[in-house]
Design a protein with these regions (language model features):
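N-terminal intrinsically disordered/low-complexity leader segments
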Residues: 1-49, 60, 241-252
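Hydrophobic/aromatic-rich alpha-helical bundle segments in the mid-to-C-terminal region
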Residues: 3, 161, 183-231, 240-252
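Amphipathic, non-transmembrane alpha-helical scaffold segments
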Residues: 47, 55, 101, 160-172
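Helix-turn-helix
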Residues: 53, 57, 61-95, 99-100
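Residues in soluble alpha-helical coiled-coils and helical-bundle/repeat scaffolds
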Residues: 63, 77, 91-95, 99, ...
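Hydrophobic alpha-helical connector segments
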Residues: 99, 113-143, 193-200, 223
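Short, basic, alpha-helical segments at the C-terminal edge of helix-turn-helix-like DNA-binding modules
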Residues: 102-107
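Amphipathic alpha-helical segments used for helix-helix packing
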Residues: 137-165, 208-213
Length: 252
């Protein structure tokens, strides 16, 4: 009975020798690596979710009390975390506000930059921009960020400067480039919009202010209002351009 057992043991050793220690060790190392990566991904997802919860709580707290009065203790309570957890992600209240701007508004800036860079006719681009604004800003909590900047910016110039640098300066640069091209193609009768691209964003600001103050008295159809604004704006520009073209025709 001992001999068969001895032969089986030798056969097992031979099989291991044939496979080689590197291959069996490699399998174990591979499994360990997958488990470690999975755990790391889970930790990263949990950290990202906690960070997002803090940002959402900060938006609620800043909106309810203003930047000066809002306390990080209350932000932590809203987010369901300890106050010390906030400092794992943000240095102080100002950096939390700045990251709120960056997280909420910068992705929309990117979408608008892409729309403005298509080279399509200006009115088509503007229609796309209206849809982005209505869907991604006015229809979401992002409009609360803009309300905060309107109310808090004058009292906290550093926050206004940050918003201008991260959001407005990029939008104005993209708008001016698109408007210059449209003017060169004859789509605009003058360079007024190139000089004052803020005119394109004006109805969005009006919509946000109106919705916060007067919407319960007279609800505003934001999309229709913005289109009416652009009809008026480009209608005037088109009339100016047509007048210029007619004058040029008579001169020849």
């Amino acid at each position: 009975m001992a001999k068969p057992a001895k032969r089986q043991a030798k056969a097992a050793v031979a099989r291991v020798d044939k496979i080689g220690p590197g291959r069996t060790g490699g399998r174990r190392a591979g499994r360990s690596g997958v488990i470690a990566a999975s755990r790391q991904n889970a930790r990263a997802a949990k950290a990202a979710a906690r960070r997002d919860a803090i940002l959402e709580a900060a938006l609620d707290e800043f909106s309810a009390k203003g930047f000066a009065t809002a306390r990080l203790d209350d932000v932590a309570k809203r987010a369901g975390v300890a106050k010390g957890t906030i400092y794992l992600y943000f240095a102080d209240k100002e950096s939390l506000f700045q990251e709120l701007i960056r997280a909420k508004m910068v992705p929309v800036v990117g979408s608008l930059e892409l729309a403005l860079a298509t080279g399509l006719p200006l009115r088509t681009i503007v229609e796309q921009a209206v849809e982005i604004f209505v869907r991604e800003v006015f229809g979401t909590r992002r409009r609360q960020v803009i309300r905060l900047m309107i109310s808090e910016g004058p009292r906290f110039p550093a926050l206004a400067e940050f918003y201008y640098r991260e959001v407005l300066s990029r939008l104005l640069k993209a708008l001016r480039g698109t408007l210059r091209q449209a003017h060169a193609r004859g789509e605009l009768g003058s360079d007024a919009l190139v000089r004052f691209p803020m005119l394109l964003g004006a109805p969005g600001i009006i919509a946000i202010v109106w919705s916060g103050l007067f919407d319960r008295f007279e609800p505003l159809d934001v999309r229709a209002m913005m289109r009416a604004h652009f009809d008026t704006l480009f209608g005037a520009a088109g009339a100016s351009g047509a007048s210029g073209a007619s004058s040029a025709g008579r001169a020849t």
